[in-house]
């Protein structure tokens, strides 16, 4: 009790002006709004449609146990040792083969580096490619943590709107022409083309190919983030942009977080060896190497065919939850509310009538027992207030229905004002 009291006193009345020791960049850092929101609802009776968490029921616990036992019996010396910065070679070989077979991407182990989740990959891309003032194109809306990772390196963000077919490349072309007239050029276009986070939409094949043409014409690189691509519940698959990349302009990001388990913190970058080499050097000073033990388990998971067998089970588990959310939205939402109808992934994006600020409305929703992520944080310029992201993978169908019902009641009350 005495220790708890002292800790509380230190928090309430700090003995130093700690702020003065932080760098200017550190002072500019802001906590993830989603992470802070999750703290708010994690211990309450609130139905949370806010997080981006995979359902624990989809974790292949039994398989992981068997693989872990085998790794400790046969590969302990490697698995428990430091590894190379570029990654565990057998895993990189297995990933290259998997991407060739799955996506028809001509790739080898020299094109792949493992990372501590794809979030680290985003930070490394910022370190290696972004100078202050560089123009980075992002989708509007886009992945909040990508904005956080890139913002640290002080780029200028340009937003391109999404529609039901993903990034509007016609508007992108207009913006590229406009910037060219001003003597400016884009360095990176960051996109989540398949089951986009937060919107859930998918870029069609025609737009993917056109984006590559624009990259060549205007000399920029594409960062293709694909954490959700395997989670397809309906519709026809679309190849990654990387599959048509003949010039080596696409830096592809993959992750095991949604197809194995996020706790392993294993992602990978697939790119031209020239890019990989510089990213590898940047990673050396960050964490020396990605968790070797996790990499060896991931290798066995891919090599043993468990990955391809497990993905359909994840899809079978999530599809009813996606369907339950779409059905509940149709049943309960008032006129004037619109939402996306994703063919896969983890999220639905809702747009409310103009004048409703979903960030201000959140407290009222939580009071009714439901949480969501306000959409403002997903825009680089934070200029859209009437949107929200809803997650359907973590909560059971019956709670999804009840959560949407509570949310609709909150929205109806706001619309009466």
UniProtKB/Swiss-Prot annotation:
GO MF annotations, alphabetized: aromatic-amino-acid transaminase activity; pyridoxal phosphate binding
Residue numbers carrying N6-(pyridoxal phosphate)lysine: 258
UniProt keyword list: Aminotransferase, Pyridoxal phosphate, Transferase
Keyword Transcription attached: no
Self-association and partners: Homodimer.
Activity under varying temperature: Optimum temperature is 95-100 degrees Celsius.
Disulphide connectivity of cysteines: none
Organism: Thermococcus litoralis (strain ATCC 51850 / DSM 5473 / JCM 8560 / NS-C)
One Pfam family it belongs to: Aminotran_1_2
Biological processes per GO annotation: alpha-amino acid metabolic process; biosynthetic process
PANTHER family assigned to the protein according to its UniProt record, in alphabetical order: AMINOTRANSFERASE, KYNURENINE_ALPHA-AMINOADIPATE AMINOTRANSFERASE, MITOCHONDRIAL
Catalytic activity: an aromatic L-alpha-amino acid + 2-oxoglutarate = an aromatic oxo-acid + L-glutamate
Lineage: Archaea, Methanobacteriati, Methanobacteriota, Thermococci, Thermococcales
Family (UniProt): Belongs to the class-I pyridoxal-phosphate-dependent aminotransferase family.
CDD domains: AAT_like
Function comment: Catalyzes the transamination of phenylalanine, tyrosine and tryptophan. Shows virtually no activity towards aspartic acid, alanine, valine or isoleucine.
Its EC number(s): 2.6.1.57
Name of this protein: Aromatic-amino-acid aminotransferase 1
Cofactor: pyridoxal 5'-phosphate
Keyword Glycoprotein in annotation: no
């Amino acid at each position: 009790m005495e220790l708890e009291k002292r800790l509380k006193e230190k928090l309430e009345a700090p003995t130093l002006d700690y702020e003065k020791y932080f760098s200017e960049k550190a002072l500019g850092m802001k906590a993830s709004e989603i992470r802070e929101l999750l703290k708010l609802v994690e211990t309450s009776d609130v139905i949370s449609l806010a997080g981006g968490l995979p359902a624990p029921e989809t974790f292949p616990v039994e398989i992981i146990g068997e693989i872990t036992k085998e790794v400790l019996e046969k590969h302990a010396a490697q698995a428990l040792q430091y590894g190379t910065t570029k990654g565990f070679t057998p895993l990189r070989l297995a990933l290259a083969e998997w991407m060739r077979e799955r996506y028809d991407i001509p790739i080898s182990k020299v094109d792949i580096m493992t990372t501590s989740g794809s979030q680290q990959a985003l930070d490394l891309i910022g370190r290696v490619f972004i100078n202050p003032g560089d123009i980075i194109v992002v989708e509007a809306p886009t992945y909040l943590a990508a904005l956080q990772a890139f913002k640290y390196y002080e780029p200028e963000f340009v937003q391109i709107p999404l529609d039901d077919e993903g990034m509007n490349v016609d508007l992108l072309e207009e913006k590229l022409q406009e910037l060219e007239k001003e003597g400016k050029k884009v360095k990176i276009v960051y996109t989540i083309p398949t089951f986009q986070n937060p919107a859930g939409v998918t870029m069609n094949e025609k737009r993917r190919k056109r984006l590559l043409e624009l990259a060549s014409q205007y000399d920029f690189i594409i960062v293709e983030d694909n954490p959700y691509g395997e989670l397809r519940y309906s519709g026809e698959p679309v190849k990654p942009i990387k599959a048509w990349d003949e010039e080596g302009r696409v830096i592809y990001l993959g992750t095991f977080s949604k197809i194995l388990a996020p706790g392993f913190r294993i992602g990978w970058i697939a790119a031209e060896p020239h890019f990989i080499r510089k990213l590898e050097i940047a990673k050396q000073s960050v964490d020396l190497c990605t968790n070797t033990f996790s990499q060896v388990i991931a290798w066995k998971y891919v090599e043993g065919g468990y990955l391809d067998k497990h993905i359909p089970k994840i899809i079978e588990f999530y599809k009813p939850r996606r369907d339950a959310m779409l059905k509940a939205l149709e049943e309960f939402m008032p006129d004037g509310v619109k939402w996306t109808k994703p063919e896969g992934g983890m999220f639905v994006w809702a747009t409310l009538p103009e004048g409703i600020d979903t960030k201000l409305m959140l407290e009222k929703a939580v009071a009714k027992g439901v949480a969501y992520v306000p959409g403002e944080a997903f825009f680089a310029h934070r200029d859209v207030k009437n949107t929200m992201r809803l997650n359907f993978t973590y909560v059971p169908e019956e709670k999804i229905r009840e959560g949407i019902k509570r949310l609709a009641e909150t929205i109806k009350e706001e619309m009466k004002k």
